[in-house]
């Protein structure tokens, strides 16, 4: 089975996390920059429910972070997670392992057939 491995790290730990994943056998990845908050960050605050206020609070108080994503073989997930835990010991991070049931690649060309990479 394939797994969508998602590693959330603070911006300053991006290089460490990427190196750890590469050393553990990752072959490719993509990253998304975002600003994140944990429940402790807004503890004691009352967040207004209108979108402008909620977004404003995130912009003001959230921590810049990065989400590193990759599709990996299930057999590699534990060693990748262990490597991240070792290299980022004492740092804040989150690892999600999402099972993938199927991958379909759309070519965009009408002449080319779609291809099921994993099923």
Residue spans of the language-model regions?
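Positively charged, small/polar-rich N-terminal and surface patches that mediate targeting and assembly
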Residues: 1-119
């Amino acid at each position: 089975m394939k797994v969508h491995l998602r590693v959330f790290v603070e911006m300053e730990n991006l290089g460490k996390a990427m190196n750890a994943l590469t050393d553990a056998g990752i072959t490719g990845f993509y990253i998304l920059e975002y600003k994140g908050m944990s429940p402790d960050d807004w503890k004691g605050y009352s967040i207004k429910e209108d979108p402008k206020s909620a977004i404003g609070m995130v912009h003001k108080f959230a921590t810049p972070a990065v989400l590193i994503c990759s599709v990996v073989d299930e057999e590699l997930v534990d060693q990748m997670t262990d490597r991240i835990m070792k290299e980022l010991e004492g740092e804040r991070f989150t690892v999600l392992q999402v099972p993938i049931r199927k991958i379909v690649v759309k070519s965009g060309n009408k002449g080319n057939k779609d291809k099921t990479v994993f099923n």
